[in-house]
Structure formats: C-alpha cells, structure tokens
Amino acid sequence: MSASLPAYSQPRNAGALGVICTRSFPAVVGTADMMLKSADVTLIGYEKTGSGFCTAIIRGGYADIKLALEAGVATARQFEQYVSSTILPRPQGNLEAVLPISRRLSQEAMATRSHQNVGAIGLIETNGFPALVGAADAMLKSANVKLICYEKTGSGLCTAIVQGTVSNVTVAVEAGMYAAERIGQLNAIMVIPRPLDDLMDSLPEPQSDSEAAQPLQLPLRVREKQPLLELPELERQPIAIEAPRLLAEERQSALELAQETPLAEPLELPNPRDDQ
C-alpha cells in the first residue's frame, strides 16, 4: 500500500523526470529552451553543483521526457558542453528532498511573474567577475537591452543575462563578447529568441528599477546638550615700550661721533701761472 503524498507534492504530468547536465550555465539554459520547445514538458529548475556544472530538470510524460531529452542531448553536444543525462520514470515523492520540485510548484501556484513581449534573452559567461562586469557594461551601452541578473556557478564562472528584442540582444552579446575577451576570459555565450514562460520563470527574478522608499528612522533618545567650556581669563600685564629711548640714544651717539671727527683740510691745487 503506497502512502499518499501531500497535495503540494503531486505535480502535474507526474509521469517521469528528465535530468541533463552541462558544463556551462548558458549551455544548460539553451538546452532547457530546446527541450521545452520540442515536447510537452515542464521545466522544474536548475541545480548548480560547482565548477561550472549545471543541471536542468524537466517533468512530464515518459514519451515527452524521452523526446525532450534527445533534443537536449543533441543541443548540449552541439555546444560541446554535454556531461550526462538520465530519465527517471515514476519518481517517488521523497525525491523533492534533492530536487527543486516544491519550490517550482509554489511558484506555479503564485503565478505572479509576467513575461509579456520578451523577444530574446542573451547570456554571457566569463571566467572572472571583472570580465563579467565589463561585458555587462558593454552590452548595456551598445544596444537597448535590460540586464536581468547574473549567476555564479563556481570556479570563477559567472553569467550575465540580458533581455530585449532579438536584434538588440544579438548586438549586445557581440559587444559583450569582445569586451570579455579584452578584459579576461570568455567561456560561453547564448542567444535564445522567443523564450517560453517556463524558461523565464526558471531564471532569477530581476531586481526592481526603483528602490522602495524607506521610512525615516528617528533617534529613540535625544542626547542632552553639553555646556560650553569657559576658558580662564588671562591677566593683563603692562609691556614697556623701549623704542623711543633706544632711538634717542642712537641719535646722541651719532652727534658725539660727528663732533669728535676732525674736518678734512681743503686740498690746494697748483696754479698753472706759477710755472710760467
């Protein structure tokens, strides 16, 4: 007799699970997009296990999962990023302990995110954060795109994700690719036209453009004003001015010196008439 699972752990299309792993986050997103567009499956989410290894998990009927995985494996091998894949028919409910199933189901129940008019998304993965920042800056300056978020997958690998029209995303990814190669090391790029809602829901939620207004925090205690310190008064002392006395003494010395010095006798020049 099998135990009945709670309502939240009875997902739709509970026939099989498909799991595929790649060596790059852009590659796993592109692989997931191909699987969603090739069969009637639901993207549960991703698992990032470090060193750039990323796994996409899909759910649906066994035939749909098999068809989707075949398309996903071919896509990952085309990117040269394929690692492994498997199909789990009739998965048990306790697999949600290691798979992001409950989180995905809660997001489907809320259904608060809207993805209208998403023409394309672009992903650039670099080895090192400075190259990622430079690539994101180049993408935003080269085309009319919006930076959604960024992902870190371990071993220094990080991915920037932008969205916009197909032409703008293509131009932005090309500019970001050159900027990343100039600054550091480029690992992978991806442009996905017309992404489905399941794929957009699997990406991190974008940050709000405007920050929420924060209430003004008034101090709970008002500090008392400290009294000003008074400086002690200094005693006034008379200052003797000796300048006039010194000037008079110098004048008297100059007069005495002039009287003691004899006047020079006049110099007598010879008369030229006496020579005649």
UniProtKB/Swiss-Prot annotation:
Gene3D superfamilies to which the protein is assigned, alphabetical: 3.30.70.1710
Region (Disordered): 200-219, 252-276
Application notes: Heterologous expression of 12 carboxysomal genes in E.coli (ccaA, ccmK2, ccmK3, ccmK4, ccmL, ccmM, ccmN, ccmO, ccmP, rbcL, rbcS, rbcX) leads to the formation of bodies that resemble carboxysomes, have densely packed paracrystalline arrays and RuBisCO activity. These structures open the door to generating carboxysomes in plant cells to increase their photosynthesis and productivity, as well as tailoring bacterial microcompartments to specific metabolic needs and molecule delivery.
Phenotypic consequence of gene deletion: Cells make aberrantly large polar bodies instead of wild-type carboxysomes, do not grow in normal air but do grow on 4-5% CO(2), called a high-CO(2) requiring phenotype, HCR, no accumulation of CcmK2. When ccmL-ccmM-ccmN-ccmO are deleted no carboxysomes form, cells are HCR and RuBisCO is soluble.
Localization per record: Carboxysome
UniProt function note: Required for formation of the carboxysome, a polyhedral inclusion where RuBisCO (ribulose bisphosphate carboxylase, rbcL-rbcS) is sequestered. Required for recruitment of major shell protein CcmK2 to the pre-carboxysome. Suggested to be a carboxysome shell protein, but it is not detected in gels, mass spectrometry or by protein sequencing.
Record's protein name: Carboxysome assembly protein CcmO
Species name: Synechococcus elongatus (strain ATCC 33912 / PCC 7942 / FACHB-805) (Anacystis nidulans R2)
Species lineage: Bacteria, Bacillati, Cyanobacteriota, Cyanophyceae, Synechococcales
